[in-house]
């Protein structure tokens, strides 16, 4: 195991900066996930750690050693890519041992490591098979095994589940989580799928246009996003946003006017520092935090546009006339409502978020479970 530290790391191709002043501390044995939309720089960041991309400026440390100029093979890292990249003419055992053979490892060492890793990944009964005889999930396990037999200090995974169908992704997610718990290796995992990030990570790094938007535990990012980008990216369906105007402030409270015909006002339990009366801000509320109207004091009303019945839950898209945008309401179980009907939902102030015009969040003061 080894720690990974990035200090003011920047990557640029000419005038185009793809990673800017990245500062990260990844501790020994941590499972860290880089997540963000396409083009945010997450794979580039992983490749710089691996040594497959040069660092324009800044410093990379693995353990106590500065690695900027160290060749990839000498960094003690192993990498799994989105593509399995298995040799079709070699068996599972031969694919897994290929790197060790090139490195000149002794046969008994190779056999011991391959058998140990095959047992961990439940591949023992498949060692003699060729890749064409394997399922997608089995091929990905072989690709992971090929990296594990080299016993890297840091394990890098670049969107390893993207080529799998939904059911296999869930299965492999569970297997990767178990593998980390069993081996205790430092793992850095890249994905655009925030569900993978939330379920796998000890710590999530959210990237936006080459910058670190926020670093924290999954539930910290979900309940206390640092800005509107993180709030909208973490969570599915994504957070609802409403334009509001500040009408009053008090200690640890901000009063805002909702964009409704009755101009209803509501006090939000958020930090009021630097918030000015009259300022235009955004109120955020997650679909699953909206309430049935009969148990709430603050009511929003609109017309049902779309109803998605998922069996275990219902997602209702409601158009609020005064703001000409849809809100998404999610409720467990089946909710029977017709498209075109008028539907009212409740807005719980303690579950609301408040964002300034520059996108930064006012710190929420409501204590959420698990954080």
UniProtKB/Swiss-Prot annotation:
It comes from Shigella flexneri serotype 5b (strain 8401). Keywords: ATP-binding, Cell inner membrane, Cell membrane, Membrane, Nucleotide-binding, Sugar transport, Translocase, Transport. ATP binds at residues 36-43. The keyword Nucleotide-binding applies. It is a peripheral membrane protein. Its EC number is 7.5.2.1. Signal peptide: none annotated. Pfam families: ABC_tran, TOBE_2. NCBIfam families: PRK11000.1, PRK11650.1. The keyword ATP-binding applies. It is found in: Cell inner membrane. The lineage of its organism: Bacteria, Pseudomonadati, Pseudomonadota, Gammaproteobacteria, Enterobacterales. GO terms for cellular component: ATP-binding cassette (ABC) transporter complex, substrate-binding subunit-containing; maltose transport complex. This is Maltose/maltodextrin import ATP-binding protein MalK. GO terms for molecular function: ABC-type maltose transporter activity; ATP binding; ATP hydrolysis activity. The complex is composed of two ATP-binding proteins (MalK), two transmembrane proteins (MalG and MalK) and a solute-binding protein (MalE).
């Amino acid at each position: 195991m080894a720690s990974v530290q990035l200090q003011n790391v920047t990557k640029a191709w000419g005038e185009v900066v793809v990673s800017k002043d990245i500062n990260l501390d990844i501790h020994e044995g941590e499972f860290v996930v880089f997540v963000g939309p396409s083009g945010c720089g997450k794979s580039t960041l992983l490749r710089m750690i691996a040594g497959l991309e040069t660092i324009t400026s800044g410093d990379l440390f693995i353990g106590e050693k500065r690695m900027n100029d160290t060749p990839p093979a000498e960094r003690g890292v192993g990498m799994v890519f989105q593509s399995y990249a298995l040799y079709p003419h070699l068996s599972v055992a031969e694919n897994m041992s290929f790197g060790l053979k090139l490195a000149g490892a002794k046969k008994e060492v190779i056999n011991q490591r391959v058998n140990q890793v095959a047992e961990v990944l439940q591949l023992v009964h498949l060692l003699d098979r060729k890749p064409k005889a394997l399922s997608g999930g089995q091929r990905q396990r072989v690709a992971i095994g090929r990296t594990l037999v080299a016993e890297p200090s840091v394990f890098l995974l670049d969107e390893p589940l993207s080529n799998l169908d939904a059911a296999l992704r869930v299965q492999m997610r569970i297997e990767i989580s178990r593998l980390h718990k069993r081996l205790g290796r430092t793992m850095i995992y890249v994905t655009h799928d925030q569900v993978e990030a939330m379920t796998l990570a000890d710590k999530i790094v959210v990237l936006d246009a080459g910058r670190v938007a926020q670093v924290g535990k999954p539930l910290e990012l979900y309940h206390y996003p640092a800005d509107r980008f993180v709030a909208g990216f973490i969570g599915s369906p994504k957070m609802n946003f409403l334009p509001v105007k500040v009408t009053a402030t008090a200690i640890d409270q901000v009063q805002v006017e909702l964009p409704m015909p009755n101009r209803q006002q509501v006090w939000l339990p958020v930090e009021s520092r630097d918030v000015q009366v009259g300022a235009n801000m955004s109120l955020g509320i997650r679909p699953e935090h909206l309430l049935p109207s009969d148990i709430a004091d603050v009511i929003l009303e609109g017309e049902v546009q779309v109803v998605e019945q998922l069996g275990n839950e219902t997602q209702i898209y409601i158009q609020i006339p005064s703001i000409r945008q849809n809100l998404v309401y999610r409720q467990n179980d089946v909710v029977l409502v017709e498209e075109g009907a008028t539907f009212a939902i409740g807005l719980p102030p303690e579950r609301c978020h408040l964002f300034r015009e520059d996108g930064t969040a006012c710190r929420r003061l409501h204590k959420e479970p698990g954080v």
